[in-house]
Amino acid sequence: MLDLRIQQHFIDSADLHYQVADGLAKPVDAAVQAVLACVTGGGKVLTAGLGASAGLAQYLAGLLVGGFERERPGLSAMALSADAQMATLWPEEQGLASQVRALGHTGDVLFLISSQGSENAMVQAVQAAHERDMSVVALTGHQGGALARQLRETDVHVCVPHERVARIREVQQLVLHCLCDGIDTQLLGEQESY
């Protein structure tokens, strides 16, 4: 009964992936270069997100430390915590910013993931990163919201221009895979097709 509806989800997702591929290639490449400059220069990548985006942030940190599709030494990365225990230590909006101030240093990258970019906690995290002379990579959806407006010219904004959160997250996961593949290609060279 739901066959056609399910098929439509696949079609809609594939269509969006195809539509945004050209527009996202350059910002994803810029994100690769920012992360690569950070980790090869002795810095670390702090990843963060709220809600479901926190899961993607943890996933990215895991891929950077543990590798993507090829063996390589681990890269210095960690996911900032947005869980309930940490939330009791600071007011909700200050939690990520407090962690950035405690763990971030000049030359590090703060990699934020948000479907909308409207969360005040993310905006405060960007401000904290800038205070620490860190670069910011923001992976957002919609138009990037207040988060995008906080970015500097030297930061990187990868924005999935879509309104549906499910579709945004699907593309964001592919962006993370492209990022990790780009890093591996830069570090290890081209790999033959699979």
Where are these regions (language model features)?
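Glycine-rich, small/polar surface segments that engage phosphate groups of diverse ligands
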Residues: 34-104
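A charged, well-structured terminal subsegment
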Residues: 165-194
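Short beta->alpha connector loops at strand-helix junctions that form conserved
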Residues: 81, 114, 140, 157-164
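Short, glycine/polar-rich helix-capping loops at beta-to-alpha or helix-loop-helix junctions
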Residues: 139-154
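Generic N-terminal amphipathic, Lys/Arg-enriched alpha-helix
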Residues: 1-23
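Surface-exposed amphipathic alpha-helices with a cationic face
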Residues: 126-133
